[in-house]
């Protein structure tokens, strides 16, 4: 299959005109997590065919005893059945001329048991001979909010510009859910499991040219064709940032990956070398992945790696400086004119007008400092990006006072972000108090709505900024 044909085929997979759910539950409710309920709740506009041997109707839709008895064409069939009958269901799909089968069903080669391996091979044989394309088995399938497709009813219906390709179903659900909470929304997500047919390479090749997608992320345990994967990723990174978690690189992780999705993982050294050559941004976990995605969705590109830091707490400022330097960012001295301006704005006791800047500890005065201080830092030719951190749990007194003062400070940051010539990054340390966590979430959402990137701590922020810059430096070299 040519690259063009492959992309066309994947596009059709994300745009099925009809879906059959084999194993649809007869007792499904609108508010349930059943596959039919999800499609209805998410507003899928195509035809839905519940398949159930005993039910005549499910959620107001006519049910059928088998795929073969559906009167019209079927683009996608979701297998929600015990693995031991999956070969029979695939034979029905083959006879019906189904285009794509999504095997949510698990119990195949990932178990390491002979029965599961043999059955997977048989399902694969039937599908290949009939030309049925397969997602899975052992996977969650598709999440495409714009098209009404989802593998979780509680996930956001709002579309974004980030795509995620995941070998793991749980990782796909967790990433979307956590991303939604952090103001990150998705164009298309696929969980592909054991990948007996379609794998990450197929989906990434399509997403690299997808106009809805600006950033691509992936969780990968292993690949079938390393040469093709490398070529596709190398092409992708010249068009869009590609952030990846490579799992299964330790001895224990390799063993776990083999039992999870039945793949061969490869050594850390091989994958690290590949990521560097191809321009892939490698991360260790879902949290780091979302941190980097946050930068690509919300951060304007700085002209360099020099950071101006503003935050309460001298020790926090020192640690923030160390964190920056450790990941390849710089925290330079301000120009004399900047220094003079900041000294006029900041009182002497318990503060610092040097980089990192520590303004007055009273949060109520921060809005005033931001108004002039950030403008001065913005004009300093020694600085490329400004990072301000607010530790909410160190402020005593009534939570209403904290909220009012923080509201004022964030108001100023939002207004200034549209005036400053350099990117602004906000860190909100929520701390351990339930009250401050609630305030932090509220202010985070205000910042995100205004297009300001927000992080829960300085470490996450500076690592993300550095990786963001590394990708753009890679592009500067290869394009």
Residue ranges and their predicted role:
Residues 1-479:
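Catalytic-core regions of core metabolic enzymes
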